[in-house]
């Protein structure tokens, strides 16, 4: 007990909360009957066809289902497409015979964290909250206000779901842009890092992004495709997002190509060469 499997949450923090009686862990879902609120934060990967896989969300709903009771607040935090909370999760929970927004509360509040940044504290990161009804939203605001300084209510679960997607798509698209510029400027003999450092001195209308060997992490390479998939249901094309995905996906091969060029300049083959990678995380 007290061991953390999340890299940026030290075991000492878990042990401190355990000792203070503020945290307990259990695999017994019947305890939900004594709870005022349940927060679902499970993975939302893509399947082999690069389509959304919300099975972890639905299975969580099914685990909660037998224990849904009057007044319970259920909040989904997993990044997903608009409509997951008020359509898919709601349908599972209402099999209890209780009605969302009437008998129990349902809301969505996207997870926000900055892993790897020791100065980032969840309590200080504004929290977006959207409810199925105004009363649902108010209950979620009350819950999160006990731990987080600033709460940002929005009009619906869908607006909150779309907010998270916008945040991650914004990052993915801008990384793709600078990855493409990296290749263009390299061909011109221009140092893209020098250009970025000069551009970021502009105090308005610019935000620096940096090139790299593709996208990393659990979110940015995946989340944009949740929206591209859902958009097709509405007859909409997301060409910009999909093009950004293509650019970022191609970056590892660009790095290999540049490495090959550097070795060739030294009359060495990439096969059999020993290569030091700095900054690998």
Protein language model annotation of sequence segments:
Residues 1-281:
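Structural/interface elements that position substrates and couple domains in central-metabolism enzymes
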